[in-house]
Amino acid sequence: MLRAQRPRLARLRACLSRGLHHKPVMALRREDVNAWERRAPLAPKHIKGITKLGYKVLIQPSNRRAIHDKEYVRAGGILQEDITEACLILGVKRPPEEKLMSKKTYAFFSHTIKAQEANMNLLDEVLKQEIRLIDYEKMVDHRGSRIVAFGQWAGVAGMINILHGMGLRLLALGHHTPFMHLGMAHNYRNSSQAVQAVRDAGYEISLGLMPKSIGPLTFVFTGTGNVSKGAQEVFNELPCEYVEPHELREVSKTGDLRKVYGTVLSRHHHLVRKTDGVYDPVEYEKYPERYTSRFNTDIAPYTTCLINGIYWEQNTPRLLTRQDAQSLLVPVKSSVVPVEGCPELPHKLVAICDISADTGGSIDFMTECTTIERPFCMYDADQQIIHDSVEGSGILMCSIDNLPAQLPIEATEYFGDMLYPYVEEMLLSDASQPLESQNFSPVVRDAVITSNGLLTDKYKYIQKLRESRERIQFLSMSTKKKVLVLGSGYVSGPVLEYLSRDNNIEITLGSDMTNQMQQLSKKYNINPVSLTVGKQEAKLQSLVESQDLVISLLPYVLHPVVAKACIESRVNMVTASYITPAMKELEKSVDDAGITVIGELGLDPGLDHMLAMETIDTAKELGATVESYVSYCGGLPAPEHSDNPLRYKFSWSPVGVLMNIMQPASYLLNGKVVNVTGGVSFLNSVTPMDYFPGLNLEGYPNRDSIKYAEIYGISSAHTLLRGTLRYKGYSKALNGFVKLGLINREAYPALRPEANPLTWKQLLCDLVGISRSSPCEKLKEVVFTKLGGDNTQLEAAEWLGLLGDEQVPQAESIVDAFSKHLVSKLSYGPEEKDMIVMRDSFGIRHPSGHLENKTIDLVVYGDFNGFSAMAKTVGLPTAMAAKMLLDGEIEAKGLMGPFTKEIYGPILERIKAEGIVFNTQSTIKL
């Protein structure tokens, strides 16, 4: 291998016109970009061969290089710092730009052939210095296969690393395994030592010392190149058996625990045409976009460790997407009763070693390479986040991009053996002469990226790629994502603030409240547009059609109007409000339009759903059953600001709050359906709360709770109730207003602008059926009787001035007028704070028969001179869902609530960073 082929040497020596004393000089530069880069392109034995041919070889001193400088000197190299004498300079990785020397021939891995942005400054400097650059990556044979590469050693090191990582991960899951005795590849002096450690681990496996509860371990190798072969060399030292991909399912369940199983995956094993499920290799090469991968369904569910050695090209199917990872991390129910000290794996797929280190490639969620210093991370698919700990939920990931540097001596010798036959002709390169005058072999000539200050013909495409990328970057910077926010009420502030953190989002705010829009425009970079939804449909439609997303913060009755405009323009939409029957009627139209409309993203509904689904899904994963679910939530004034007859204040329009008590409600209690009629009788359903006793709370059922048995997937629950929390006394006061007819949404002509103004005394006289001219005492007496002799309710009416001469606001209905009046009397002052109180209670029956009583509490206070608690807890989850849609994190289409992990998982995780933190407690009854 060290002797160059005689015909090639004869040809090269014939080209050497200079005398022996003018022979070219070669230099081995030291690696100085990465602390772990201890390799060299040639080993001492190669230097010895070159010096025997009469060439001078300079060795730049390096204490980092794994092979000692003395070894190179013994081989005939000359140790010196100054390498300007050399015409050929060899390295492994790129040199710093400031150390490049003009009109020299350099050979190294430049990582420029795809116009990689990180190395374009290097390429510019190479061109400026008129350097002839030979890139090892492009030294290929007539079939296009690489001749010079470290691939095999990347596979060897990667496999050793992931076995070590699996030992750590399995220990975190409660299992000691023989893999715990393996270290990282660089901890071994050479691969022989590492292999011996693997053999020792394999011996323990063959003795049956693997934990039974984790089942047989399966390893899947993608690709058939040097990377995969190197990884398999290490794997073969274990007691292993190779099976076909279609056999994985069976061996993953019933395989022998005294061995591990492997399969080598080729394209035909998982790629199929979308139309008929057939694989045609010729067609795939031409039209990869016609194909999809079945890896996620046919192979990944039965894989313990994936060793990926393939690169991803645009338009080709990925091996695994983010959504695939979510489904793969769902635990499979076991028929075996779990033992506390011997748990089963939470999911089959434990680890991925992505030796390709291709970020955003065939493994979609591998977005950043790990390093030798920090080799592992965990991808939590539910939360769609990456964290460094080997504990917690997720898949262990290892994606080091310089793996061969962990076994530097053997990697150097291996690489040098392949490079050595071409070194002498590279030595004859004169960078000052035209490339055409050089007598290079095709292998070397076709690897020359630059020469004489220009890109060579074969690589002129790099400049076009750069220009194309720069255009795309410019367009992406100039083409912002457009969001239309409808409504400028209390909730809009947190929504606008959260979205404004991303400079790539352009926000338009549509509202008919000019003053509020102006105030918000001063705080946030938004485009204010005057718009009255419901009366300006054409203007709404023209606004919507230019957007990427619409957020409706309007009253719920207007959401269908907005949704229709979104359907027409095929624009996604989110809202915090309930998915009403009117919205539900649009479900088919939403599906036909292929858009996403997400509702119930606020607090209640919203965060209550998300917490419920997270708890319920977790219980199901454990094989448990949810027997009861009770959730109460309320927006309240802070206790120090609750001194009024309602014990309540309004942070937005009171209409919805008032009308809520007029609605019927139904819930399930101990297996029986309880129906509550709205209006006067709702007071009978009010219950005092025994938690947070210092707050003196009461609660009442909210609308139809029973339907959530199906939505939440807990049809077996005997108790299911969703309710509203208030301070004690609120319900009684509101009940009085119902008796007086003040909570009535029917049209009331006497309150319209064209009618004569009315005082509250006059309106109340009309409502109780006496003359408007009746004296105050008479009205008070009749009202007292109407209220059933309840002094508390009478005092509430008097406190609000309903028996006085204050003018009634103009409105379409009595409840609208009453709402405006309440806003004037019971709005929050500039220094007053609100609070949110929510409690979710679950009864969870575990497979052991134990009953777990679990509570989740949320208490949030408004900020002094900042956002209210209600605005934060409604606006932030809505804004987060909107951002997730814009960023492509939510791919599902249709009308939906936040009932899937894809939606609730990231929101519940991210909202913690905003200071909204939940407190969870559990007690177990034996």
From Swiss-Prot:
- Matches recorded under SMART domains: AlaDh_PNT_C, AlaDh_PNT_N
Q: Does the keyword Chloroplast apply?
A: no
Q: Where does the record say the transit peptide is?
A: 1-27
The protein's annotated pathway:
Amino-acid degradation; L-lysine degradation via saccharopine pathway; glutaryl-CoA from L-lysine: step 1/6; Amino-acid degradation; L-lysine degradation via saccharopine pathway; glutaryl-CoA from L-lysine: step 2/6
Chief subcellular location equals mitochondrion
Q: Where is this region: Lysine-ketoglutarate reductase?
A: 28-455
Q: Where does NAD(+) bind?
A: S488, D512, Q516, L554, A576, S577, L603, D604, P605
* Chain spans, region Saccharopine dehydrogenase: 477-926
Its subcellular locations are:
Mitochondrion
One Gene Ontology cellular component? mitochondrion
N6-acetyllysine modified-residue sites: 48, 52, 56, 93, 128, 138, 286, 458, 523, 535, 584, 707, 739, 761, 778, 780
Q: Which residues bind L-saccharopine?
A: S577, Y578, D604, R703, T724, L725, R726
Q: What is its EC number?
A: 1.5.1.8, 1.5.1.9
Sorted UniProt keywords: Acetylation, Mitochondrion, Multifunctional enzyme, NAD, NADP, Oxidoreductase, Transit peptide
Mention one GO molecular function: saccharopine dehydrogenase (NADP+, L-lysine-forming) activity
Tissue specificity, in the record's words, reads: Highly expressed in kidney and liver, very low expression is seen in heart, brain, spleen, lung, skeletal muscle and testis.
Describe what upregulates or represses it: Induced by starvation.
Concerning Pfam families, the annotation shows:
AlaDh_PNT_N, Sacchrp_dh_C, Sacchrp_dh_NADP
**N6-succinyllysine found at:** K93, K138, K274, K286, K333, K458, K523, K535, K584, K732, K761
Reaction it catalyzes: L-saccharopine + NADP(+) + H2O = L-lysine + 2-oxoglutarate + NADPH + H(+); L-saccharopine + NAD(+) + H2O = (S)-2-amino-6-oxohexanoate + L-glutamate + NADH + H(+)
Q: Which Gene3D superfamilies match?
A: Dihydrodipicolinate Reductase, domain 2 (3.30.360.10), Domain 3, Saccharopine reductase (1.10.1870.10), NAD(P)-binding Rossmann-like Domain (3.40.50.720)
State the similarity comment.
Answer: In the N-terminal section; belongs to the AlaDH/PNT family.
- How the protein assembles, per its UniProt entry? Homotetramer.
Quote the function comment for this protein: Bifunctional enzyme that catalyzes the first two steps in lysine degradation.
Q: Domain comment, in the record's words?
A: The N-terminal and the C-terminal domains contain respectively the lysine ketoglutarate reductase and saccharopine dehydrogenase activity.
Could you identify this protein by its name?
Answer: Alpha-aminoadipic semialdehyde synthase, mitochondrial
Q: What's the gene?
A: Aass
